[in-house]
């Protein structure tokens, strides 16, 4: 998976012979003006690309910042899963704020304009963010797998989650050091190196051709293929537990909490508004937990699927380029450029997609997003939520009766 800030490795003005391109001194200024006017100035479709990058930049920064604020401001949202979601959002903010602008300029100008130091720093941070995202998604899947499939084997806590997050960043910062070590900035036109940074490229430089093949093969397996395969297996088992069979202990709870409809009707006649009996209440709580776990699992599976789809093109292109040596003498250069450019944009689009997924699939995050935008859209503010809660409280009596009746009817059906 190539760091998306280094597409400038494909030179803008390659020479057919591979020899340095020399210009007479009198023509340097005129040549630079020609390059800017007819070659580097964004074309029409590149303006579309710029607009797409700007949209992703704004959505990713605002959305992921709101995710972090939602968990920070609300103690009831400080769950283990949400701690990992915040960590994923922090990685998305990092890559969006630092790497996205550089990647956009490189894709448009096909030149590295930021010098040698940032040539090492930006690709390194890009690789670190990829590692953090993959490890975070892996820990989320592992936590859900233990909680749902093997709840008695491991007890996840917020303290352990925070320790895991620190470990994720430490491992990612350490294992991606080789990415920074091999990045070098060089100029395709040495004669113009002192006049402009146009057509400078930031690319990997290895001592032997075998090393990049080994490194990028391992990178693809460790940061994409293997973790996604393991996470797919984990979510498959989670899916079976939540939708195919009962959570461990639910069947016994079903029998234990069951009350006959006649007993339930007798309890209802004792008052105008009676709360569900303790056993029925316990079962209702268990059903509510089941529904909440299903919603959370559904949201996390969508996040994982979107991540896999967004990172698939750049992963495949990087393996083809670095391992199999393709695209060096591409006959259709524009098509190759378009593929790499679109794949770079998809990486950043994933950062913008996550907050959107949370908004549509998580009621708690959706309420917090509405509250955050209440200053601009009063109808979406806390007032509407308060009115909704008031109506809910007024109808709690009737809802509780209906819920208990539905539960007991379901129990009767299951046990008959």
Swiss-Prot record:
One annotated GO molecular function: orexin receptor activity
Signal peptide: none
Bilayer topology annotation: Multi-pass membrane protein
InterPro entries: GPCR_Rhodpsn, GPCR_Rhodpsn_7TM, Orexin_rcpt, OX1R
Site residues by UniProt (Important for responses to orexin): 36
Family membership noted in the UniProt record: Belongs to the G-protein coupled receptor 1 family.
Identification of the protein by name: Orexin/Hypocretin receptor type 1
Name of the encoding gene: Hcrtr1
């Amino acid at each position: 998976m190539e760091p998306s800030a280094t597409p400038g490795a494909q030179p803008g003005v390659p020479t057919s012979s591979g020899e340095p391109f020399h210009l007479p001194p009198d023509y340097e200024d005129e040549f630079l003006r020609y390059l800017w006017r007819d070659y580097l100035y964004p074309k029409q479709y590149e303006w579309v690309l710029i607009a797409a990058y700007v949209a992703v930049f704004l959505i990713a920064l605002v959305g992921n910042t709101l995710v972090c604020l939602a968990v920070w401001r609300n103690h009831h949202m400080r769950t283990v899963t949400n701690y990992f979601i915040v960590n994923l959002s922090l990685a998305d903010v990092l890559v969006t704020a630092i790497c996205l602008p550089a990647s956009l300029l490189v894709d448009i100008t096909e030149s590295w304009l930021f010098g040698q130091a940032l040539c090492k720093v930006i690709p390194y941070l890009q690789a670190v963010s990829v590692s953090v995202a993959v490890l975070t998604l892996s820990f989320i899947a592992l936590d859900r797998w233990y909680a749902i499939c093997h709840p008695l084997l491991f007890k996840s806590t917020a303290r352990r989650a925070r320790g895991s997050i620190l470990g994720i960043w430490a491992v990612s910062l350490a294992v991606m050091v080789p990415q920074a070590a091999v990045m070098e900035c060089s100029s395709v036109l040495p004669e113009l190196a002192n006049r402009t940074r146009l057509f400078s490229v930031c690319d990997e430089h290895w001592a032997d051709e075998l090393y990049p093949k080994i490194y990028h093969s391992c990178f693809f397996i460790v940061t994409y293929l293997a973790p996604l395969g393991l996470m797919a297996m984990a979510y498959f088992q989670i899916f079976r537990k939540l939708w195919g069979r009962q959570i461990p202990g639910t069947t016994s709870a079903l029998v234990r909490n069951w009350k006959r409809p006649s007993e339930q009707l007798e309890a209802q006649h004792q008052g105008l508004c009676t709360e569900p009996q303790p056993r029925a209440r316990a079962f209702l709580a268990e059903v509510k937990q089941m529904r909440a776990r299903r919603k959370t699992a559904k949201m996390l599976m969508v996040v994982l699927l979107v991540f896999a789809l967004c990172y698939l093109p750049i992963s495949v292109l990087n393996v083809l380029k670095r391992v199999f040596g393709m695209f060096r003498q591409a006959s259709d250069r524009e098509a190759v450029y378009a593929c790499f450019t679109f794949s770079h944009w998809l990486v950043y689009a994933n950062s913008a997609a996550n907050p959107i997924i949370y908004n549509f699939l998580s009621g708690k995050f959706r309420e917090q997003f509405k509250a955050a935008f209440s200053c601009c859209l009063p109808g979406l503010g806390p007032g509407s939520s308060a009115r909704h809660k008031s109506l809910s409280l007024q109808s709690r009596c009737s809802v509780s009766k209906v819920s208990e009746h539905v539960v007991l009817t379901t129990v009767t059906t299951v046990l008959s």
